[in-house]
Amino acid sequence: MKKIKKKDIVLYLVMLTFCIIVCAPLLQMHIASDTYNFMDLGYFQYPSQYFLKDARIISTLFTYLAGILNLDYQVFIVGMEVLAVIIASFSIYILYKTIGKKLSENIYNMNLKNSIILMAITIIIFNCMSLEYFLYAECAVMCLSVLLSIIAAKIFIEEKNKHKYVKILLILTLATFCYQGSINIFITLVTLLLIIDKSKVNIKENIKQFIIAGIIFVVSEIVNIICMYLINNFMGSEQERVAGNVIIRNILLFNPLMKFIIENVFILNFNLWPSMIIPIFIGISIILILCSKKKIRGLIEYIFLILVAVLASILPVFLMKSPGIEPRMVMSAGSIIGISIIYLSYIFNDEKSKIMQDIIFVITMIFFIFNTINTIQIFSAHIATNKIDANMGITIKYKIEKYENETGNNVTKVAYRRDSMHRDFPYGYKKKLSSFTQRAFDNYYCIIEALNYYCNRKFEKTTMDEKIYTDNFLGKNWNTYSDEQIVFEGDTMYICTY
């Protein structure tokens, strides 16, 4: 067994410290919209109803185990977040060593070149699309999927034996059983590593290796889909994610679907990065590449790399029964800025390019600082949103108890509707930060479940009484909680959310 060097331990601890600082806001009890449903259904029903049907077997096993151990939800959620931080730091560590060996003589010497590589890798792991991997109750398993994809890419490039492809397929398939949406980073990293690996200068061989990597990527997804169908068939249920017969329908929707993807992923970045930052960075990278000695080849390689990153993210959407996209599904597209920096470092990886290396370092440092602060702010905004939801939930709880004490009625049913100009993120924020600032009491997916959590009850959902709605809520608009938003009648609470 290879002895672990002291330098490697120090290197990992530095990366772990960075991850702890960035994720510090989430190292406490926090609740995403899905988490309300998770806590409402419990450790066994929720994974059976959601994870297992989607062939997310590892997430299912984790939650089953927590149920067997009868863990408190707070212990489970915080524990999974701690585990996610540890796993993410391993992802940075392994990716840094893998890429660093291709571009640097000594990866332990934190010179300008290595600093660029390390900052770029943290931007890849903590890109705006992958931040949701730290949000949900199963966050550690989602981060594990990323780590397994990175390990698969590392083995693909570094190992020479004949059996490596079987090993990679098994690892990548295991990654799909954690979370399918993150494995698109595998093919993007393989493409990047093939390009920057000086030992792989044969273009035909590189194309062959890329095709093999693509086949492994597709086969792992197919295996996951087959398992999905088998599991649902065994359970007597119908899976709701993917189907081969919807490809033609989704292709016919190509224009509106691509418009939606381009707008949200590449222009707005789901409001998690500044608008247009990815296209702008691609433009800057192209300008810098045109200043290099390898103008033509560099441009071809870079454009191909970007196309792979984009297509790996968006092509699976065309298999979906309900085509749509969320940040967590397109980590590969979000990694474009990080991989662009690494490619630029490769292009100008010689002593004569000192000025260009300085320029790349300044650009990288500016974006690294921004991304770190931005990530902490996004995580903090999620905690602030949780507190707003908690305040409203606890206030409603006391209001219900007061009504019950005064009338003797027992509230068992809830009907809800939104006000005339509702917004699903807190007032005080100019824009919604994806799922991080999604208010529970404006999300039809989890309003009842949030009420159940804060009131410690099991309410029954019922329909809104039109007369009560017209008399009390019609045309009204609030920007904060008000007692006017709640009306009681018998055993039913009618609520109009703002």
Model-flagged regions — what are they?
Residues 120, 294-319, 366:
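Transmembrane alpha-helix segments characteristic
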Residues 185-218:
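Perimembrane helix-loop-helix junctions
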Residues 149-165, 197-201:
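Membrane-interface transmembrane helices that cradle and orient dolichyl/undecaprenyl
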Residues 2-57, 61-63, 67-117, 203-206, ...:
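Intrinsically disordered, polar/acidic, low-complexity terminal segments
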